[in-house]
UniProtKB/Swiss-Prot annotation:
UniProt-listed PANTHER family: SERINE PROTEASE INHIBITOR, SERPIN (PTHR11461), SERPIN H1 (PTHR11461:SF27)
Entries under SUPFAM superfamilies matching the protein: Serpins
Signal peptide stretch: 1-18
Protein's name in the database: Serpin H1
Motif (Prevents secretion from ER): 414-417
Length: 417
């Protein structure tokens, strides 16, 4: 492979961002969110806006099926580009984030604060293992000032040189697998260029429900990828009280499921029937989501969800370019001289790899609720066909994740007419 030969040696800047790896100095107590500074709160709002523009850009790519991105992690990557860039290269990174009025250091520091708060597993009782690494070719050395600033805001280690030949990319894959408990064994299979910087994010996220699913309420069902193609998946079922809205005009349902400690929630949007998600995606904006959520009411809902792990790796380079990040990825125009001290570096790839697990785990549920009148005749939310989902922070409104499930893992079951 050409890329293996090119990456004979590289410098490395690593940021271990997960709370499991390095916890904030003043960790919030369980169930208590840290109060964000004004700049971090502003960037939380900006990252939520980025979530929808990036999702829409990816949804238009015919080669993409399942989508799974963490907008706050992508925003943090943009912050690193603005910190290490100059002139238009830096200003474009901030423009994609709608943070033009903030200084580069403020953007990077604010995003670091936001990400540390959102990934605090002690406060939130979720599993979020997150690692971020910046690789450069062996000919490039990271500037001391850049390393110092990046380290002070993202708990990054100092750069180090790692010699490798054909094992260079394999070492990245091994790190990603270790970071995600083996859920992501290969994140660099689509590497084409290694003469520039590689920014790699690897994540494993597992929400813990505010009210768990019963482990026996799991069985094998069909998930209809299309009307004529069905795969077998494990589905988990439970009935409870959830925020719910049925938009009969647009023929879609939306349900909000609180996660443990209720600091964040999983929001699922699903068409009434099996159809491509294009129609729903055209409706989806930050403003429209707010309208839908404003119409939600607490109702009894019988929910069925696919159980298992969704593993997705994206190279976001071209999608970020479509949003305006054109200079950083251009070998002839990029000015990342605050990273290396000279204009000898460009952003070759932005790998964003995530394993997202839906399981039954969560807090014990109140068994007495099942004798109440309010749980009779529940609304049905049967997620057996493609849907869009978001993990939203209840305090800041920022999105930890946004994605769609179009084709889960599973064997073909049957053709349907």
């Amino acid at each position: 492979m050409r890329s293996l030969l090119l990456l004979s040696a590289f410098c490395l800047l690593e940021a271990a961002l997960a709370a499991e790896v390095k916890k904030p100095a003043a960790a919030a107590a369980p169930g208590t969110a840290e109060k964000l500074s004004p700049k971090a709160a502003t960037l939380a709002e900006r990252s939520a806006g980025l979530a929808f523009s990036l999702y829409q850009a990816m949804a238009k790519d015919q080669a993409v099926e399942n989508i799974l991105v963490s907008p706050v992690v992508v925003a943090s990557s943009l912050g690193l580009v603005s910190l290490g860039g100059k002139a238009t290269t830096a200003s474009q990174a901030k423009a994609v984030l709608s943070a033009e009025q903030l200084r580069d250091e403020e953007v990077h520091a604010g995003l670091g604060e936001l990400l540390r708060s959102l990934s605090n597993s002690t406060a939130r009782n979720v599993t979020w293992k997150l690692g971020s690494r910046l690789y450069g070719p062996s000919s490039v050395s990271f500037a001391d000032d850049f390393v110092r600033t990046a380290s002070s805001t993202t708990t990054a280690s100092t750069p180090r040189s790692t010699s490798a030949t054909s094992a260079a990319l394999q070492s990245i894959n091994e790190w990603a697998a270790q970071t995600t408990d083996g859920k992501l064994p290969e994140v660099t299979k689509d590497v084409e260029r290694t003469d520039g910087a590689l920014l790699v994010n690897a994540m494993f996220f597992k929400p813990h429900w505010d009210e768990k699913f019963h482990h026996k309420m799991v069985d094998n069902r069909g998930f209809m990828v299309t009307r004529s193609y069905t795969v077998g998946v494990m589905m988990m079922h439970r009935t409870g009280l959830y925020n719910y809205y049925d938009d009969e005009k647009e023929k879609l349902q939306i349900v909000e499921m609180p996660l443990a400690h209720k600091l964040s929630s999983l929001i699922i949007l699903m068409p009434h029937h099996v159809e491509p998600l294009e129609r729903l995606e055209k409706l989806l904006t930050k403003e429209q989501l707010k309208i839908w959520m404003g119409k939600m009411q607490k109702k009894a809902v019988a929910i069925s969800l696919p159980k298992g792990v969704v593993e997705v790796t994206h190279d976001l380079q071209k999608h970020l370019a479509g949003l305006g990040l054109t200079e950083a990825i251009d070998k002839n125009k990029a000015d990342l001289s605050r990273m290396s001290g000279k204009k000898d570096l460009y952003l070759a790839s932005v790998f964003h790899a995530t394993a997202f697990e839906l399981d039954t785990d969560g807090n014990p549920f109140d068994q007495d609720i099942y004798g109440r009148e309010e749980l009779r005749s529940p609304k049905l939310f049967y997620a057996d066909h493609p849907f869009i989902f978001l993990v939203r922070d209840t305090q800041s409104g920022s999105l930890l994740f946004i994605g769609r499930l179009v084709r889960p893992k599973g064997d073909k079951m049957r053709d349907e007419l």
